[in-house]
Amino acid sequence: LFGGHDAPLDQDAIPSVVFSHPPMGMVGITEEQAREEHRRVHVARAGFRPMLHALADSPQRSLFKIVCVGPERHVVGIHLLGEAADEILQGFAVAMRRGITLEDLRDSIAIHPTSAEELVLMD
């Protein structure tokens, strides 16, 4: 099927989503796992009310967290709870697998107004 080439499966890079309301998902390792495995851990968090819910005067909020390690702040975990988390996670999972850093995210131009923009605005 794959031309006779074996490829190891990186189980830390498999995104997982719960299609609840609101949806939640994660890829990579948790903050606790990062602290056990690495000396330098940086965690960026964002809590916000998505534009859709703000305009509708709904109390629903979203919580996003990015776990980074090392002086370069390589992203090793992304955890999302909120509007569109299920859709947002896939692209960021690919970026994380390719070695993205928090600085790479900060250098991106955000699409506004979206929940995904919170991930590139976090520090």
Predicted regions mapped to residue ranges:
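Flexible, glycine-rich terminal cap/loop adjacent to redox cofactors
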Residues: F2-A7, I14, F19-D123
